[in-house]
Amino acid sequence: MNLLTRLFALHFDRSFSGKGWRQLAWLFGVIVTVFLLIYLVSFAFIFPEPSLEEWTGIDKDVPMGRLLQLICLFIDPGNIVEVPPYLRWFSLLVVVLGLILFCGLLISVISNMLERRVERYREGDIVYPLQNHIVIIGFDNMVPTLIQQICDDTHYGNCHILIQSTQPAQEIRSKIHTELDAKNEKRIVVLRARRDSIEELEKLYTTKAREVFLIGERNEHDHDSLNIDCLKKIVDIHKRCNKCSLIPFTVLFEYQTTFAAFQLTDLSAEWRKYIEFHPFNFYEGWAKKILVSRQYGKGENCIEYPPLDREAITYESEKHVHLVIIGMSRMGVAIGVEAAHLLHFPNFCRDKNIKSVITFIDENADREMNFFCGRYRHYFEISSTHYYDMSKDERHERFVLPTRFKGKDADFLDVEFEFIKGRAETPAIQNLIKEWVHDSGQVLTIAVCLNYPPQSMAMGLYLPDDVYDENIPVFVRQETSSALLNMLNSKKKDEAIHKYSHVFPFGMLDNCYDLDKKSRREGQIINYIYDFKNKYGNVPQSCPPDNELKDSWNKLSVSLQWSNLYSAYSISPKLRSIGITDGYVKLDNDQITLLAEVEHNRWNMEKLLLGFRKPTAEEEELIYGSKEMGDIFKKKRFVHP
C-alpha cells in the first residue's frame, strides 16, 4: 500500500510540476472519475424521465434525462432550484463537487498554466518548431554584434534567430536589447539548454535551419573540445535526416592550435558530407579584419585601417614593408602570421635582398621565439632569422641559421621574422623605433598586442613622438571599448589631423566575425578557374552559378580550400603593387607573368605556415618519379615540392 501511495504521489507531483497539458489531463481525469461515481450513485434515486408525449408537445416543458440533469447540476449551481425536493440533498452534493472541481481547480489550473507559460518563456524553456531560421549555439560578447549583422543583411530576410545558451534568458535578452530595435527584437527566440546533449540539440531543428553559428559560452576552459563534441552530435542528427541539405556551420575555435589543425588536415572530411563546415578563430578573425577587409564597424563609427603597403611596392621600388608587433600574445602572433601570408611584392623578384620584415618585441622573446619556431618549424628549416637581446644595457645579436636546408635550398623566401627580447618602453628599444621611423627604405607599421588593454593603450599613446609626427599607423589592442581611441583618431573633414589621428583600436571582444562572404566567393572563383584551366586548357570567360561554385568547393580538401582563400586575401596587395587600386582591369602579359611569380612566392609561404614542409633531394626524386608517391607525400606526410 505504501509503495502504491509513493508511486501515485511521485507521478502526481511530476505531472503537476511539468507542462500544463499534464495538469489538465490530471484534472479532467479526476472530474470524469468523480462524475462517473455521481452518475452511478444517482441510480439510488428516482429521476424524472421524459415521455414520448412530452417530447412531442409543443407548449410543454420537456424534462431532461438523468445524465443531462447531472451535467447541468455539476457545472451550474443555479439548476438546483429545478430539482424535486426529495433530490435536493443529493443535488447539493453534486453542486458542491462541481463548484470545487470547475470553479476552483479548473480556473486555478488554467491560471497556473498561463503563469507557467509566461515563466517558461522568460526562462527560455519553450521549444518552437522553427524552419528556415538562424541558429546560434552559445552566447558571448560577439553574439549581439553578430545578430545585428544578421538583421541588417537583407540576404537573411526576416527569419527567426534562435539562441541556445546555458546563461539566463533574461540576461541574454537584455544584452541583445541594446543592439536591436523593437522590430528585429521580435525575431529573437532564446532557448536555455546545454550543447552537449543530443536531446537538447534536436530542439534546435538544425536540419531545417538556414545557417548555424556554433560560438560556445564565455569563459569556458574546454571551449574547443565542447564545440567539437557538439558538432559531432549535430552531424549525427543530420545523418538520420534523409532530405537534409548542406547547411553552413560556422564554428568558433578559441585556440589557434585547434584552428590550425582544421586548416591542415581533413579532420572534418566526414562532417562535410552532411554540413558546410567553416571554422574561425577570434585572433585570426581580427587579423583578417585589420589586414584584409581593413574595416571595423559601419556608419559614422566606421574605422578604416590603412594597408601595411600604404605606398605601392612596385617592381622598381627599393622599399620594403616592416611590421613591428609589440607583444607576442596570441593576437600578436596571429597578426604576424596573417601578415606573412600577405606581404609579397614584385621588387623581390628583381632583388632577392628586399624582403618584408615582421619584428616581434617581447620581454620573453627568447621563450616565445622557441614556441613560434616549433609551431612553424618547416618555415625555419628553410629561412634564417635574427634574434636580439635588448633586455639589458648592451645589445646582443644572434643570427639563427635554417635548421635543415642550406645553400640554394635555403633563404629563398620573401618574408623574414625578427625577434627582440626587451620591453618596448626602454630607451634602447624606443631609440630603435626612432631609427625605423626615419629609415627611408621601409614602410613601417606598429601593432601593440599586449594582453593587458590599459598597458596596450599606454604603450600605443607613449611611443616616440617621431612615430606620430611621421603619421606611422599604430594599431592598439583593446577588449571592451574603443571609444577613447575612436575619438583620438577622428579624422573628419572639418577637423585638423592631430597627433593621434593614426592610432587605431582593434581586438574588441564584441566584434570579430564578419558575415561578408566576399573573400570566400573569391576563393571559390579562384578554385573554379584552376579547375577549368586544368580541364580545358584556357581561362573561363564567365562565372558559373553559385551552386556550381559551391559543389566544386565542397569537393576540395580543407588545405586546398584555405590555399584558395589566402590567395583571395592577397588580391588587393598584388593589384596595388602594379598600380591598380580601383576595380579590376585587364592585365597585359608582363603583368601576368610578374604577378604569377609573386603568387608563387606567396604560395611557398602559405604551404610552410599551414604545416607542409619542403622535401629533401631524395624525397623529390620519389615524388616526381611517381604520382602515387607524390600523393602519399602530400596527403599523409604533408611534404610539398
Predicted features by range, described:
Residues L40-A44, I71:
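Extended, composition-driven regions rather than compact fold-specific motifs
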Residues N2-F35, F45-G65, G78-E606, P615-P641:
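Cytosolic regulatory regions of ion transport systems
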Residues Q69-L73, D152:
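Short amphipathic alpha-helical coupling elements at transmembrane boundaries
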